[in-house]
A protein has these predicted regions:
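Transmembrane alpha-helical segments and their boundary/interface "anchor" motifs
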Residues: 1-35, 49, 114-125, 174-184, ...
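Short juxtamembrane and helix-loop transition motifs at transmembrane-helix boundaries
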Residues: 9, 24-34, 50-59, 78-84, ...
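Alpha-helical transmembrane segments of multi-pass integral membrane proteins
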Residues: 12, 125-230
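Short helix-capping/hinge motifs at transmembrane helix termini and TM-loop junctions
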Residues: 17-18, 61, 82-86, 194, ...
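Interfacial loop-to-helix transition and helix-capping segments at the boundaries
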Residues: 30-45, 81-100, 132-157, 202-207
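Short, amphipathic, aromatic/basic-enriched membrane-interface segments that mark the entry/exit
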Residues: 35-41, 59-66, 88, 114-118, ...
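Solvent-exposed interhelical
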Residues: 50-74, 103-123, 198
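Juxtamembrane membrane-interface segments at transmembrane alpha-helix termini
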Residues: 80-87, 104-114, 159-167, 189, ...
Length: 233
């Protein structure tokens, strides 16, 4: 529902700017399948993964292992479907990280204990992850499996860093609370400021877009919370 309300804002913006829209594409934009200027691929991916998880855990319920295997297999199928219907690569090239993250959570206690056994073991895995990332960066264009390995290697590096370093501050926390609003609304100020000719100064354009996006996302999230309370309280 929040996504569709955001799409309505894009419809209003396009009408105000005189951007042409056809009915079919506009209606499909409300399903996340197409776009009228809004970001949509991430929502398509998340909705698909939610459906896969609901299906897997509805069938296997408390049996986590077969549910995880099912999620992994269906994620690969989902990625292949998106590839075959002609969706851009960013729709599916990081999908596998979702079940990989679930596997890590499932085995976290054992993985962390083994990796953090001593500094030598930790450095071995860090060097291996960085090496794999570097190699796969050069060959990631050879096919989806190579990109998945590249993406997983990057995720491994981040996980290994967070095993040693705690990352967090009020700014990151604030951005995390408003991540959906920022993601979905960021493309509204961009064309408006472009139309006003403010994109001639890159720094001014960037900071204006960033500031307005933050303000819009904060207001949007506040209004959505109030709407949710009225509808679901």
């Amino acid at each position: 529902m929040h996504f569709d309300i955001a799409v309505v804002l894009f419809v209003i913006m396009n009408l105000a700017l005189g951007v042409k829209m056809n009915l079919k594409n506009t209606l499909l934009a409300f399903t996340t399948w197409t776009s009228i200027g809004n970001s949509n691929w991430y929502i398509t991916a998340v909705l698909g993964m939610y459906l896969i998880i609901i299906l897997a855990f509805s069938v296997f319920r408390k049996h986590k292992l077969p549910a995880l295997i099912t999620v992994s297999v269906l994620t690969v199928v989902f990625a292949i479907v998106l590839l075959k219907v002609g969706k851009p690569e960013w729709y599916y090239n990081t999908l596998l990280l979702f079940p990989v993250g679930m596997w890590y959570a499932y085995l976290k206690k054992h993985i962390d204990k083994f990796v953090m056994k001593n500094n030598l073991t930790y450095m071995f895995f860090m060097v291996a992850a960085v090496g794999l990332f570097t190699v796969c960066y050069r060959i990631k264009g050879f096919g989806l499996p190579f990109y998945w390995i590249y993406a997983c290697a990057f995720m491994m590096i981040i996980i290994l860093i967070t095993m040693k370093v705690k990352i967090g501050n009020p700014i990151l926390s604030m951005l995390g609370r408003h991540v959906f609003g920022i993601y979905i609304l960021q493309r509204i100020p961009m064309p408006i400021f472009q139309r006003l000719g403010l994109n001639g100064n890159n720094m001014l354009y960037f900071f204006l877009c960033f500031a307005v996006t933050l303000l819009m996302s904060a207001v949007f999230d506040m209004l959505m919370k109030k709407l949710d309370k009225k509808l679901f309280a």
